[in-house]
């Protein structure tokens, strides 16, 4: 059964990791998908893979900086122009963001982190909701948050604070958009084997009930449920896909502290741009 037959979806951060896996899954379930990313090389590579699977008639790509309002407006317009409407938005684009001690983080890098991690969620929702309000069946907005946004000690400061904002945004937007049958939900991944966490995956073994690292398909399957009509009565929630990691917050903080200690994160400062194609700049702090 194709669970998204004839629905139209926009997915940001679609060139790799969770976004790529979700785009492929949505296409396999009958959706028309606009894939957005700021990494031109990996975006085109992903579209080539879609062509190989003979799914390209239901897909198109859009080079997008999710922190730029005009780019988001263009992205949503593309979905409507190509496929007639917009039913699903998956705000998934992200970066590691500014890292380092609070006393040394660069303010511009802090702002840039929030632009990509949080402002993008607002912008995507703003323009998607304008279209979804016209739909008889409303729509589904799905936002990638993180377990780092649920408490202290489980991620870099800027990243964690921005993801906490994503979770709260979902709750408030769900209340506002509910009367229009627009559902707004978040997914908080735990340790997922993606390009953004590749180093951590190699260096760590987290203490959690399900003793394994998650895969992008685990998040994609959750997004598929939230995008489908099966979740028609669910809004404003945050689903943790983390192998039970957050069930023991003390263990989570201990594991995170050990991981960041191994990375020497308290001794470096800079900006982790993830898989955007923009070089990360991280420097050692002077003693």
Regions found by a protein language model. Give the residues of each.
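Canonical Rossmann dinucleotide-binding motif of NAD(H)/NADP(H)-dependent dehydrogenases/reductases
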Residues: 2-34
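C-terminal helical subdomain
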Residues: 186, 202-234, 239-243, 268-287
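Active-site loop immediately N-terminal to the catalytic Tyr-X3-Lys motif
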Residues: 102-103, 151-157, 179, 211, ...
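Active-site helix of classical SDR
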Residues: 125, 162, 170
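Alpha-helical segment proximal to the catalytic Tyr-Lys
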Residues: 130, 175-179, 232
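Catalytic Tyr-X3-Lys loop
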Residues: 103-122, 142, 159, 166, ...
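Residue(s) in the substrate-gating loop at a strand-loop-helix junction
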Residues: 146
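Conserved mid-core segment of classical short-chain dehydrogenase/reductases
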Residues: 96-111, 130, 134, 155-158, ...
């Amino acid at each position: 059964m194709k669970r998204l037959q004839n629905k139209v979806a926009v997915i940001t951060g679609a060139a790799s990791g969770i976004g790529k896996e979700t785009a492929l899954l949505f296409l396999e379930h009958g959706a028309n998908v606009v894939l957005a990313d700021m990494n031109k090389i990996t975006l085109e590579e992903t579209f080539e893979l879609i062509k190989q699977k003979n799914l390209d008639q239901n897909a198109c790509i859009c080079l997008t900086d999710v922190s730029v309002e005009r780019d988001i407006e263009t992205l949503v317009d593309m979905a409507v122009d190509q496929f007639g409407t917009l039913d699903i938005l998956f705000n998934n684009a992200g970066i590691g963001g500014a890292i380092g001690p609070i006393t040394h983080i660069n303010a511009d890098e802090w702002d840039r982190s929030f632009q990509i991690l949080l402002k993008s969620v607002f912008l995507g929702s703003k323009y998607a909701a304008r279209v979804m309000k016209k739909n008889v069946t409303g729509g589904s907005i799905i936002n990638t948050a993180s377990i780092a946004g649920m408490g202290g000690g489980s991620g870099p400061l800027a990243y964690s604070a921005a993801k906490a904002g994503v979770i709260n945004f979902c709750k408030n937007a769900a209340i506002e958009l509910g009367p229009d049958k627009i559902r707004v939900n978040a997914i908080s991944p735990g340790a997922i084997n993606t390009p953004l966490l590749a180093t951590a995956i190699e260096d760590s073994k987290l203490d959690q009930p399900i003793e394994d690292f998650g895969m992008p398909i685990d998040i994609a399957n959750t997004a598929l449920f939230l995008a489908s009509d099966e979740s028609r009565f669910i809004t404003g929630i945050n689903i943790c896909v983390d192998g039970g990691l957050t069930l023991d917050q003390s263990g989570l903080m201990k594991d995170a502290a050990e991981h960041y200690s191994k990375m020497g994160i308290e001794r470096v400062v800079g900006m982790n741009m993830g898989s955007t194609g923009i070089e990360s700049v991280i420097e050692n702090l002077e003693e």
